Amino acid sequence: MAEKAKKKKNGGGGNQRIAFYKLFTFADRYDIVLMVIGTLSAMANGLTQPFMSILMGQLINVFGFSDHDHVFKEVSKVAVKFLYLAAYAGVVSFLQVSCWMVTGERQSTRIRRLYLKTILRQDIGFFDTETNTGEVIGRMSGDTILIQDSMGEKVGKFTQLVSSFVGGFTVAFIVGMKLTLALLPCVPLIVGTGGAMTYIMSKKAQRVQLAYTEAGNVVQQAVGSIRTVVAFTGEKQSMGKYEKKLEIAYKSMVKQGLYSGLGIGIMMVVVYCTYGFAIWYGARQIIEKGYTGGQVMNVITSILTGGMALGQTLPSLNSFAAGTAAAYKMFETIKRKPKIDAYDMSGEVLEEIKGDIELRDVYFRYPARPDVQIFVGFSLTVPNGMTVALVGQSGSGKSTVISLIERFYDPESGEVLIDGIDLKKFQVKWIRSKIGLVSQEPILFATTIRENIVYGKKDASDQEIRTALKLANASNFIDKLPQGLETMVGEHGTQLSGGQKQRIAIARAILKNPKILLLDEATSALDAESERIVQDALVKLMLSRTTVVVAHRLTTIRTADMIAVVQQGKVIEKGTHDEMIKDPEGTYSQLVRLQEGSKKEEAIDKEPEKCEMSLEIESSDSQNGIHSGTLTSPSGLPGVISLDQTEEFHENISSTKTQTVKKGKEVSLRRLAHLNKPEISVLLLGSLAAVIHGIVFPVQGLLLSRTIRIFFEPSNKLKNDSLFWALIFVALGLTDLIVIPLQNYLFAIAGAKLIKRIRSLSFDRVLHQDISWFDDTKNSSGVIGARLSTDASTVKSIVGDVLGLIMQNMATIIGAFIIAFTANWLLALMALLVAPVMFFQGYYQIKFITGFGAKARGKYEEASQVASDAVSSIRTVASFCAEDKVMDLYQEKCDEPKQQGFKLGLVSGLCYGGSYLALYVIESVCFLGGSWLIQNRRATFGEFFQVFFALTLTAVGVTQTSTMAPDINKAKDSAASIFDILDSKPKIDSSSEKGTILPIVHGDIELQHVSFRYPMRPDIQIFSDLCLTISSGQTVALVGESGSGKSTVISLLERFYDPDSGKILLDQVEIQSLKLSWLREQMGLVSQEPVLFNETIGSNIAYGKIGGATEEEIITAAKAANVHNFISSLPQGYETSVGERGVQLSGGQKQRIAIARAILKDPKILLLDEATSALDAESERVVQDALDQVMVNRTTVVVAHLLTTIKDADMIAVVKNGVIAESGRHETLMEISGGAYASLVAFNMSAN
């Protein structure tokens, strides 16, 4: 349903573009000044062409009518005017380019910021139904570039060209009205073709954008859940989805190229036919109306430079089409008024809040699942200062109560009251600031531990942070980390174990010092010892606060002032534990009995933690203890910490990094060409077409010089010659009609294929990186998504537009010099001497612009990560009113690239102005030199114009290429960044086909003398000489303190990492010698925080089986995981979308789907990392039964805090100080007096 709604939204009807002027909605006064100066300068710059044609007319008459002796004197008068024109053109073109580039950068940065700000202020329902992180990042990195392109220098260029057009026609009317009127009908033809083409192009641009946004979602999901993807060997699946989206974009891009070529081709035919007609009709005007040759040429050049200028508006129009299409969705979001607005400052603010909560007759459905009724007349009262616990089955709506109190959603009917006032009447930010939330899956941001904690209170002092950490029992493990509070936690907190993350989240809530406390399974990720200490901290915290607790473990809620049992959308029982336990038939009593049934185990259950406590005490004294604060990742799969382990280490890494990028820059263009090798035939044909297209320019110059000569011939000869040259011009137009569509179409194929190949290869390489690569914050999902979308698009411009232009211009230059030298070698030599000035000017433009791009892009990537983090954790951002904090951080990351953009604008303006200045100065010098040669009888008037037109058209070609410099430079940066990805060689490569495949897998596992440290935390030893043997079919449970490395064992078995020394064997074969994808197929992993993809429930379960599963297999697996009944009760059953990271489901529901996925895989080895921690007692019992059945004849490794699940294990191993301290069956270990395991259990019993 959500999917359908989304599709409808994205692709649905209407013309999805905004009006062009609306792009500038967010301009401030400074921008308006810049745009006015830029526009006036562009208009003035556009008039240089008409002025030049006036001077050209004067010049032609001087050359045509002056006698040889006075030609130099007369020409020098006109040449001085050319120098004035040069100065004028230099200044206005500088102002045009720099003003528009600077304002483009300013406004696009503002749009990025406004878009993120608006996204952050939206109600949570918007994220459930209308957007996701991938889309937001795609829009902020890809779409804003298109918008910036359409509102920067392209607007100036467009204004300049239109001004040239208007100026040209004005001059033509003044000089020769009759001839101009005769030529006028050609103009609508030119304009009409351009308009039709732009319309079609914008349609195609929308299709391309939509496909890329969807491709971005695939990247976001895969990289954000990379451990799940590789554990289920889902790389090919992700690639398949990605390539499907790329194929749609590819087809649209090719059509775009074809239509643009046809449009330009038709336009050029019209232009050249106009030339032909003008020559023929102009000749008649000379004979009949006494026009001069200069007049006719003036009219022709004025109309044609005007008409050509209109033709050249195409790239700008394409840009405007792409920009207005990209802006449509972004501006629509910016304008969206949220139902619950965090920025709305109206609403009540009380001087003091007591904390009485009441839900009165509430009816509620989630926006993403409007067909599932969650609450039907739900009522609950929580007096201030009281603790109320909500219990009930997984999915009964306990967490929904918390969402309604936080005002993430509003009820359909009924009221949520605080202190007797309807929640809707309060100022949203103020009321949220009075509520502290700790959720079941704590969300941390990809920054330091300190930064994560101060989300609770902006200006918290060090002392306050320390106190909060002590209360949350988190200071011990943080003190052991080399960087302490400055340790990076990784994307989604992957560098920490579940328990460590939860304690930081609790510290954050403690720091907020809220009046109302909402605890959603707040201690579910903790081991018994941490849970007891944190529970004590929470009890202190709850004093004189209104607290609502959602819990599965009933031990944690017995002391609550009131317990409410939630079932089928209502409170069906409430009272204290002692009151309700008296009714043996009550639902609460039954729940308690269910857990009592496993009470003995529960005792053990809480146990591993005694060991934890003693370990913590032992190692807290010695900073360098072997276990100095291991960090494991959330999925239990261990991760890493930021690069800045030590200054030296950090610098080494960054210096090698810059070296690679630099090296990449040297080779990138040649390598890019190599990537386009399969399209060599297409490129050759395209280049051939470009060459012919290029030769047309000097040939046109040659024809013009011949034409000028005929205007000074006797009437009878003029009549015949004019018809002949007119037909030659028509032939030239027909040539263009063939070669331009060919050139554009073929280069579009090559460019689109290259983009597709680069995106595909890069994503494939990303998917097959080893996990430690993703542990580096530089490779987070937001950054990778931004790199794939921005870099591939930028690189395409080198192959498509730029390569075509280079071939075309080279042909123009070579053709021009051949024509010049055959005319008069002296004149040509003179032209050759001044030409280098033009080339150097172009070269220096490229050099100047180099060096700004790379740095700025890196910063925008960092900014993308800030946005990605915030959007994927939107509930946490909303709950902690952290919208402003996120915006400040984003702003900080954008400041530097914005400054770079300003510099780039000024430099580009200087170079662009310089090119015009040089062009006209050179022409002036040429006129003087030419007239001197003519006066001295070393050249003729005809030869001079043949050389002159050849030179000017070449110069225009070179200047045009040099304006492409920003594109070439951006593409080089992007290419370096792409080859950075393509060249990274993973140590553990899942794409490798090498390695043995065992004919039969028994499942014997052995870890022999394993030592291990995380690659990015080389200063912390996790294992030192760890040995463990697991026989085939055995169930082995790992216990130990939070962060002792239990989950690291699972990571090593899955080969997410390789040990530093020692061996890991499967059936006596070292796992490093086995084929990696095959090895992972033998293992089924269920992690502590299950990762689901933003798809249907059915496809999430089917993900477990390579090559897809039948409906029957999916249902069987769901039944085994005790999730089939719940799925069947949903209106869309297995077709229900789970939302981003599974937000539409409760923790228990997600976990059961993850278990079904692992069951479907039917693995030989089962790895359960806290697999039932998120389940309530009822679900846990049934899932545990299911797991028990699944474990039969399978080797199983269990990591658990709840010892119910491990008492019956064939072997229990205690992980302590980097080795296995004890191992054996429960009974055996209990007999070791003073043993780690026995003391855990004893501690647990007393705690219970």
UniProtKB/Swiss-Prot annotation:
A GO cellular component entry from the record: plastid
Glycosylation sites: 473, 652, 720, 779, 1094, 1193, 1244
Disulphides: none
Binding positions for ATP 1 per the UniProt entry: 392-399
Pfam families according to UniProt: ABC_membrane (PF00664), ABC_tran (PF00005)
Subcellular location(s) of the protein: Membrane
Transmembrane segments: 32-52, 82-102, 158-175, 179-201, 261-281, 299-321, 682-702, 722-742, 813-833, 834-854, 914-934, 939-959
Record protein name field: ABC transporter B family member 7
Organism, scientific name: Arabidopsis thaliana (Mouse-ear cress)
